[in-house]
């Protein structure tokens, strides 16, 4: 490696942390990971969303000689990260199908001439000999494999092209690799290591705990009404994501919210590419927008002020649930993860598993994922304890989730379980019939419905033996028996059948403890909205904070980027509290790197002094969107020019001065990778490229 010594590299990494990214110290294991990769070692990194994974490859790319090549699964993710890096003065570019031939050639030329610090590629590009030959001709500092869980063949985000990434070490054996993901069980972790052929990699596993997120799971009654109550009472005016299982549910829910005064937009793969891009852009740029989406939405979205993530349908796995809820509260502020869950969710998921492709082993694997999700829903433990245990980590009760705030009562459900299981047995043995939960509950409660009379079920000996429980309670019994593996669902109609474990309950050899739903679901300790003062902001600083937010909003609109690409709320809060009176003092604020200090420092000082700031960015950077987000280098470096090709470079030869660096205190990296402006090409159908396999649509309803 072209460096003087390991200590020099470490020193330079700290300088990069501060000068480029505006942080004073690394967080958690960031420094250890960065030092290891700078030294040429392979690494597998498991770190939660908002934990600063991106810094772990961005800083080594700026310190090591050559260009860091980042393998990213989504085109939108590449665009977002590149745009935000340009704003920091990092020379970043990408190659994907949104570019025409001339644009691609420009980026390729910059790569070969060493005018890039980072190059983003989709994994599909590495199946193309032309791309491989390009990489052979350049100097590569490292390979970063982002969203590495996509290599897990039976995972929730599997991408087949990730399987081919094992060839990186074969073709470039001396180039270090770092694989990163925000969610992985021990099994997925092992699969990542094996499939990417990284046997000698060091493994870094951070805590998956997200203490600022409150986890709440409610019994599904009228889910859209329940959601509306949550938004009105606790998240008025907040940005959030609502996940639904189907496209039809997405459309209906978005329409319902709009009709009730909520700014909501749909997002699913059934919408055309332009509409999806426009809706995503509005979510990123406008305050208080709610996106209602299938799980196709969210990977790579770095909007820090998402205050809630709601699920109106049961997620397929705990891993998927964790990843989706992790999109809330990236800024560290209190946020809500809310899920409405009902019996029909289980029926639907079982039906999907039965009809899924793959062998019996695959279906058993999907069933085990669903069973773990059901167990999380029905637990009487702290949600956080149960969630972290799934990932092999230990934690004490959080005191903040619904089960901690309103501990559910438990009761002995053995007798009701025996009654329900006996009813199923009698229907099968005496009548040769199978029915779903609704009919079983009607029989138990002694309800002479038309269907009960039609099948003569009122003559069964078990008819009416469960009159002591209401229908909702019987549905709760069914849900919990399913979660405990004492009951199963089969077929298109969701009929209930016994399992091997059911016999022990019927014989009286096993007790069945159950949770009783609280009369009223617990709320957050204090309702939050974007209009409320942030929890860590002194009251006297609030007017200054709002003035800074207003300036940031105007500046972002002028430049055509999301507000948090200018500065995150956390940085504005620190500025409002510290009230710096000079650019030197402003430069010590977390999140204010040299490039942003040069561009925005005088304007911020004007706002703090109560003066009207001059329009546009300073230090020679134009205020129009074409050039605003693209300045490269330090305050003394020439302004950069951003091209539609997906790269930004300075006029100075060789490495950008960003490599001299600048990163630190709580270096989550969130401030570095906000989603940036969407290039015009991202809104259009990409041209066919000869010899290049199509990149998968970002928005598949998995």
Predicted regions and their residues:
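Accessory DNA-binding and partner-docking regions appended to nucleic-acid-acting proteins
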Residues: 1-13, 366-367, 394-702
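Helicase motor core with emphasis on the C-terminal RecA-like subdomain
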Residues: 2-20, 24-28, 32-44, 48-54, ...
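Helix-turn-helix/winged-helix DNA-binding modules
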Residues: 25, 301, 379, 431-432, ...
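Eukaryotic partner-binding/assembly regions in large regulatory complexes
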Residues: 311-313, 377, 416, 476
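Short, charged low-complexity linear segments at domain edges
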Residues: 362-391
